Curated annotation (Swiss-Prot):
It holds the Pfam family RNase_Y_N. Residues 114-144 are annotated as: Disordered. One of its GO terms (cellular component) is plasma membrane. One of its GO terms (biological process) is mRNA catabolic process. This is Ribonuclease Y. The keyword Metal-binding does not apply. It comes from Streptococcus pneumoniae serotype 2 (strain D39 / NCTC 7466). The chain crosses the membrane at residues 3-23. Residues 227-290 form the KH domain. It is found in: Cell membrane. Endoribonuclease that initiates mRNA decay.
Length: 537
């Protein structure tokens, strides 16, 4: 029983152990499955998180790459733009410097070529000068011998004509001289042209020597300021257009204006030289209008010169009116105002005559007021005292005589007429006002720096030079150029033939030598131009 009980107990224990083992095994298996499930879930979640993280990382990387590429492109574009701008600036600077260097090199080359050419010419002239002088001397002897032969022929013809025709000596001489002049006109003209051609090459050197000597002796600027006008050019290429083909433009300009055009190596500058201020002002206005317009040819030059002559005429009237109002004489005759306006372009010993007249008028008015005289009449007389100088180069007589005639013509008071007549002491002063004006004239002229004796003498010499040329038959007009070293004469082609041109130049030269005192040489140029104009309709 006890064994049975023990066996049962043992069996129960075994059963309990088996059941416990089974129970424990079941629990362990359940726990393991749960753990495995949790592990699978954890792994799945980890896999999901890793995938999401990888995707987010890929997105961030891609976005970062895009931003990096965009920034890189912007930086590259900015760098390229800056490089392009810098390269353009450098290229422009280099281009400007190259252009400037090219211009400088071109000028230097031209000057070197010109100097070489002048040096060659001077060398050639020096080598042939003695030979030409000897040739001229021989020809002069031949001409003398020929003249003797001609005189002998004339004597023979005189005797023959008197014997055959019973003519008087005077009649025979006239016939012979007429025949001789007609037969020898061509020969004389040819001889003169040959002689001029032989000494032409010497003239350039002599003119340069004279110019150098004058420059060394005189260093003042006054004459240049009084006789020169400067016109600025947009560029040096305009110099060639001003000269024109074969010099046509510059010759037309100089012949129409009577002003010398100086074109030298000075960059972008043309100088207009002439002693007549009105001509020089017309030339300056014409040149500036030609440069602005751009059309430079003889017809346009002629058109603008005529237009500017009319413009100057209007300015002259305005100057006269303004001066009359300034001195308190607004009731002056309009023609007298215009004549007085011309004095704006007239100088006396370097002093502007219109300003001098205004100055005399004001001084005379002040002195008349102090003395109890008619101040308005004194100003009027002082203003008109030099009116004759406005046209003394056009009308015969002194400026005093011309002024008296003008005052009488326009019915000025007798006091004014006597003041004009007596202000240089030519006649006796008949009023206190005449004495006052003479004193005011002396005060204005004696003011330090007011006048220059040399300029007046210079201008008078140029006027005399033109008067000599204009005195010959067939001469239309003449212009003194190159500071009086050249006289250019325009002749009527209907009265002066080609064969007579050289003879006219020779006669003018002889008369200048006999009547004028002048330094150096004077070139006489006679121009005969035949122009035909028609209109197509």
């Amino acid at each position: 029983m006890e064994i049975m009980s023990l066996a049962i107990a043992v069996f129960a224990v075994i059963i309990g152990l088996v059941i416990g083992y089974v129970s424990i095994s079941a629990k362990m298996k359940s726990s393991q499955e749960a753990a495995e499930l949790m592990l699978l879930n954890a792994e799945q979640e980890a896999t999901n998180l890793r995938g999401q993280a990888e995707r987010e990382a890929d997105l961030l990387v891609n976005e970062a790459k895009r931003e990096s590429k965009s920034l890189k492109k912007e930086a590259l574009l900015e760098a390229k733009e800056e490089a392009r701008k810098y390269r353009e600036e450098v290229d422009a600077e280099f281009k400007s410097e190259r252009q400037e260097l090219k211009q400088i090199e071109s000028r230097l080359t031209e000057r070197a070529t010109s100097l070489d050419r002048k040096d060659d010419n001077l060398t050639s002239k020096e080598q042939t000068l003695e030979q030409k002088e000897q040739s001229i001397s021989d020809r002069a002897k031949n001409l003398d011998a020929r003249e003797e032969q001609l005189e002998e022929v004339e004597r023979q013809k005189e005797a023959e004509l008197e014997r055959i025709g019973a003519l008087s000596q005077a009649e025979a001489r006239d016939i012979i001289l007429a025949q001789t002049e007609e037969n020898l006109t061509r020969e004389i003209a040819s001889r003169i042209r040959e002689a001029e051609q032989e000494v032409k090459e010497r003239s350039d050197k002599m003119a340069k020597d004279i110019l150098v000597q004058a420059m060394q002796r005189i260093a003042g600027e006054y004459v240049a300021e009084s006789t020169n006008s400067t016109v600025h050019l947009p560029d040096d290429t305009m110099k060639g257009r001003i000269i024109g083909r074969e010099g046509r433009n510059i010759r037309t300009f100089e012949s129409l204006t009577g002003v010398d055009v100086i074109i030298d190596d000075t960059p972008e500058v043309v100088t207009l030289s002439g002693f007549d201020p009105i001509r020089r002002e017309i030339a300056r206005m014409t040149m500036e209008m030609l440069l602005k317009d751009g059309r430079i040819h003889p017809a346009r030059i002629e058109e603008l010169v005529e237009k500017n002559r009319q413009e100057i005429d209007n300015k002259i009237r305005e100057y006269g009116e303004a001066a009359a109002y300034e001195i308190g004489a607004p009731n002056l005759h309009p023609d007298l105002m215009k004549i007085m306006g011309r004095l704006q372009f007239r100088t006396s010993y370097g002093q502007n005559v219109l300003r001098h007249s205004i100055e005399v008028a004001k001084l005379a008015g002040i002195m008349a007021s102090e003395l109890g005289e008619n101040a308005a009449l004194a100003r009027r007389a002082g203003f008109l005292h030099d009116i004759g100088k406005a046209i003394d180069h056009e009308v015969e007589g002194s400026h005093v005589e011309i002024g008296m005639e003008l005052a009488r013509k326009y019915k000025e008071p007798p006091v004014v007429v006597n003041t004009i007549a007596s202000h240089h002491g030519d006649v006796e002063a008949e009023s206190v006002i005449a004495v006052i004006v003479a004193a005011a004239d002396a005060l204005s002229a004696a003011r330090p720096g007011a006048r220059s004796e040399s300029l007046e003498s210079y201008i008078k010499r140029l006027h005399d030079l033109e008067e000599i040329a204009n005195g010959f038959e067939g001469v239309q007009t003449s212009f003194a150029l190159q500071a009086g070293r050249e006289i250019r004469i325009m002749v009527n082609p209907g009265k002066i033939k080609d064969d007579k041109v050289t003879i006219l130049a020779h006669k003018v030269r002889k008369k200048i030598e006999n009547n004028l005192d002048y330094p150096g040489n004077i070139k006489v140029t006679v121009i005969r131009e035949l122009r035909a104009v028609d209109y197509a309709k």
